[in-house]
């Protein structure tokens, strides 16, 4: 297997603190770049844990179609602005941020007061605009999760009628693009590939960390396949063969042999397969001639029994 290397050839941080990193991975065998790129992209876009605003509460508001006196934006606009906030919570529990701003003022994300567990990535993002003589009291809920979580209206907490739920987007990676460079050539002229992958995040995670977390997830996914062992089903006995299910009557034994076997509770070939030649001789009134007759009848259908118990 080829030993490849990973180089970060570009890293940018935008004004809103979003980050973009470009990585070059290679050399790879033909076809491996596509395999690697698709796997990385799928996990990067939907498999990493992130933080998001999941609900807000505005003083004096109990539904999303309301307006707030003295605030330029309506409640739907405020909901959308809060949904787009980039946050990073290090807590597994619900975190709540609060603000009370008196106008005239432009309410920014940096006005939210969270515990030390939550970082607001872009503090300059505008939430609302408050006019002179008015104020805005806002509560923002932040949680951690994976992927996309729509509001479940059926299970919504109806006891908190003023808590406005938000469809949560927990994905810290916003965009992944990759392409394949096939210009690398190995000794002997065989083609090699390099994967160029561009990762853009919301700033709550660096592209380097996103790539590392993705690689670890894929390792955990594939590692068990390297030590696959077949587990036999416990308590499941194999079904008897068709020959074993043949009734004793169809062996065409003599009357003497047949009657002796019946008295010994032998009703089918399956029962006979538990006997050795010595066991047959121990059946009452069952001599060697009858035993030989049974052996021959079994051999005609392709079944043999051991000579003695020790050879069974």
Curated annotation (Swiss-Prot):
Residues 246-312 are annotated as: Alpha C-terminal domain (alpha-CTD). GO terms for biological process: DNA-templated transcription. InterPro entries: DNA-dir_RNA_pol_insert, DNA-dir_RNA_pol_RpoA/D/Rpb3, DNA-dir_RpoA, RBP11-like, RNAP_asu_C, RNApol_insert_sf. One of its GO terms (cellular component) is DNA-directed RNA polymerase complex. It comes from the Bacteria. It is an enzyme of class 2 (transferase). Residues 1-229 are annotated as: Alpha N-terminal domain (alpha-NTD). It catalyses: RNA(n) + a ribonucleoside 5'-triphosphate = RNA(n+1) + diphosphate. In cyanobacteria the RNAP catalytic core is composed of 2 alpha, 1 beta, 1 beta', 1 gamma and 1 omega subunit. When a sigma factor is associated with the core the holoenzyme is formed, which can initiate transcription. This is DNA-directed RNA polymerase subunit alpha.
């Amino acid at each position: 297997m080829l030993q490849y290397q990973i180089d970060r050839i570009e890293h940018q941080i935008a004004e809103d603190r979003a980050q973009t990193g470009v990585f070059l991975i290679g050399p790879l065998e033909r076809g491996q770049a596509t395999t690697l790129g698709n796997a990385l992209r799928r996990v990067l876009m939907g498999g990493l844990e992130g933080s998001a605003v999941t609900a807000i509460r505005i003083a004096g508001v109990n539904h999303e179609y309301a307006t707030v006196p003295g605030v330029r934006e309506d409640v739907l606009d405020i909901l959308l602005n809060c949904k787009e906030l980039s946050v990073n919570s290090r807590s597994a529990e619900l975190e709540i941020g609060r603000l009370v701003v008196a106008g005239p003022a432009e309410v920014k994300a940096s006005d939210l007061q969270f515990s030390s567990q939550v970082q607001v990535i872009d503090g300059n993002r505008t939430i609302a605009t408050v006019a002179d003589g008015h104020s805005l009291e806002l509560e923002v809920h932040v949680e951690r999760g994976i992927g996309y979580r729509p509001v479940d209206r059926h299970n919504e907490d109806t006891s908190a009628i003023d808590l406005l739920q938000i469809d949560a987007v927990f994905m810290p990676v916003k965009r992944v693009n990759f392409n394949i460079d096939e210009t690398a050539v190995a000794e002997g002229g065989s083609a090699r590939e390099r994967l160029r992958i561009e990762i853009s995040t919301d700033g709550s995670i660096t592209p380097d960390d996103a790539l590392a977390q993705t690689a670890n997830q894929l390792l955990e996914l594939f590692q068990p396949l390297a030590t696959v062992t077949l587990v036999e089903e416990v308590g499941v006995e194999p079904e008897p063969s068709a020959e074993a299910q043949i009734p004793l009557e169809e062996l065409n034994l003599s009357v003497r042999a047949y009657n002796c076997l019946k008295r010994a509770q032998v009703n089918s070939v399956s029962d006979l397969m538990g006997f050795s030649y010595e066991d047959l001789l121990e059946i009452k009134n069952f001599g060697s001639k009858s035993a030989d007759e049974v052996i021959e009848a079994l051999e005609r259908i392709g079944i043999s029994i051991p000579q003695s118990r020790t050879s069974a």
